[in-house]
Design a protein with these regions (language model features):
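Loop-helix junctions at membrane interfaces
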Residues: 1-284
């Protein structure tokens, strides 16, 4: 048995991994980090052991910082101390494939440490897709700077199709069947529009790390909105629909952390330090 169904303090039935389930999650994390070695083939050479250690350290530090909460909503969602930035760094350093796998590995670790699973499909979107989207920072990896426009357009298209198809396969039972395709097309448009806005803002900023971070945070926000809309609409404030509630609720904590992080990243001493760390990560 990989999980138990237990009742939490609010009377909700949640899925909690058993010991075997936790072991499997750890194995998955290690496997994903190992797969990063193969995705690095798009670069001039494979990831070295040192670079793989940098990925693991980013996950570990991101996990530690995720527990330093500057603000926490009672119903979920927190403004943490730079935790999303730490998860974005491997993608920015080593490319899109490595970034996505690192983000998913981080999501699995979060599920291992603090699971909050009401539906199996929610596990996919809240832990795998939302945190995996932080790896989209790889669209601005140094190796991709010569093809930024091509990579960003591909990211928008990929994100749109992924959001629409994930909704069709996983969440149509929560929406009227006759309108499920229309809902997912509309959500895909929202996904693509938000990514386009993030990219436009990113091009206005000279710092590539800030661009990468904005794009990655936008990706996480989209999946957080989808989860809130479908699974947590019953928590909506009086007079609010599920989708507007999810849009505002998730924006409050995700973009608040993003704003604090961007301000910190633009400080000259921090920019210099981040450049030195990147050079160290990419050095032979």
């Amino acid at each position: 048995m990989l999980y138990n169904v237990v009742e939490n303090d609010w009377g909700e039935l949640t899925y909690v991994p058993t010991m075997l389930g936790n072991i499997l999650l750890v194995v998955l994390i290690l496997a994903l980090l190992g797969l990063s070695l193969f995705f690095a083939k798009k670069h001039s050479k494979k990831l070295t052991v040192k670079q793989l250690v940098f990925c693991a350290m980013s996950i570990a530090l991101g996990t530690v910082l995720s527990n330093i909460k500057l603000f926490h909503f009672p119903t979920g969602g927190s403004v943490t101390l730079l935790s999303m930035l730490l998860v974005c760094l491997p993608g920015y350093w080593f490319g899109l494939g490595v970034g996505l796998l690192t983000g998913v590995a981080y999501g699995i670790l979060q599920m291992l440490i603090d699971p909050y699973i009401l539906f199996p499909a929610q596990l996919v979107i809240d832990y795998l897709l939302a945190f995996g989207a932080l790896g989209l920072s790889g669209a601005f990896a140094e190796a991709n700077t010569q093809n930024k426009l091509k990579n960003n357009l591909f990211t928008i298209l990929l994100g749109y199709m992924f959001a629409m198809l994930s909704g069709l396969f996983f969440f149509t039972n929560h929406i009227d069947s006759e309108s499920s395709l229309n809902y997912n097309i509309l959500f895909g448009v929202l996904f693509a529009a938000l990514y386009a806005a993030a990219i436009i803002i990113g091009f206005m900023v000279k710092d590539n790390l800030v661009k990468a971070y904005i794009l990655a945070v936008a990706g996480r926000y989209v999946f957080a909105v989808l989860s809130g809309w479908i699974f947590f609409g019953s928590y909506a404030w009086d007079g609010w629909g599920a989708l507007p509630y999810s849009l505002v609720y998730n924006a409050i904590y995700i973009f608040a952390e993003a704003a604090v992080t961007v301000v910190i990243l633009l400080l000259p001493p921090v920019r210099k330090t981040m450049t030195q760390i990147k050079n160290l990560a990419l050095s032979d």
